Amino acid sequence: MVGPNRVFLEYIGNVLPSLGERSVQQRTALDLCVPKVDVTGVDDNETRRWKGSEEMLARLVEASTAHVQVLDDDLKVPVGARTFTFTRAELSDWLQQALAGSLPVNRRRDSLKGLVQRDLQRRYDRDDIWDKAPALRAALTSMWPTMQPIRLVDRLLPGPGGKRRRWTVADQFLVDEANSLLVGPPFTYGHVVVDEAQDHSAVALRCIGRRSPGRSITILGDLAQSTTPAGQREWNDVLRLLGASSADGTAEVAHLTIGYRVPAPILDVANRLLPFTGVRTQASRSVRVEGVEPLLRMASDADLAASVADEVKLVRHRHHNTGVVAPEALFPAIAKALDVVGLHAVDRVHDLGHLDVPVFHAEAVKGLEFDGVVVVNPHEIFDGSERGARLLYVAMTRAVQVLHFVSSQPLPVELTP
């Protein structure tokens, strides 16, 4: 089971065991990556998009053999009293034969060794001749040095390298891709379930696809909730990156349009955002026709945080499981205001105390649900990025009972009928 983030996995962590299923491993996509790097850096949105793109996949393929080069001159190899000459043309031909193979790059290097070794034995007619030709072995190492995945990615990326590099999450997925190109397939599973699949980059989807060589994969997602910089906009692209296709029968796409979680009065308003998400998707309809339409509480900028705290107390009076979705810049003020009314802002959904209130930004709340949701400054979420309509859609559809807005400005006109 591959979830979008650690908070989500903690949220659903007890679901399968409660059903008697204890053999399923629950991971984030990042957990699947090998070999590991120490992730301490953070990319900006444009860099995340670039590093997660198919362009980077192509650049990695090119870089994986860029260090392989034929010698400048013919190679003379002394063996005992004799000297054998391997012409540059011969070496180049063997090199191209080895490179043309389909094995991982470091194993194709062994193919080059086999071609040269066979020719040397033909010339000298002795089985131990390879051991007596250290100059030849050194020359082959010079032509085709062994490359390690972390070093390959370090050389490919801009910025300070080596020990000075601050690796990021996107870099870790590139290292996993490099490992596949150089070393070969990683550990695998019999079946993989991927939730929130639309948020994964092209490079991350490749990482997930390799974990099921037989392409036994179930993916779930909503393109209208694709909120990451390198996320997906077409299911056909997702399938292709996983190594499957609906066109050739190796995959089947089922559109689920009946909702059981979000009440119709909330979902109908959220669906007004779909034309502005930039993706092709079908609006869902809820079987829960009863419910309350979203409510708006206006507040000045100066009173915004205090109004949020008051609204949370009001919603919690009937719905203890209440969460806040807000722009991250407002977190400190909201936390302080919650403290004033005797509540505590937390960034988790497990092991909650009676007075704890989860507070998240829209991207982090993906996959979670609350009986009551308080969305702060929806206009700021909507206008904050090109993904704003999708982020606001995510925020609104976390509510399974009531949705309240607290805002210093009117709701985005896109939410009006």
What are these regions (language model features)?
Residues 4-48, 177-191, 198-417:
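Conserved helicase motor core of SF1/SF2 NTP-dependent helicases
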Residues 1-193, 198-207, 215, 224, ...:
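Alpha-helical nucleic-acid-binding subdomain
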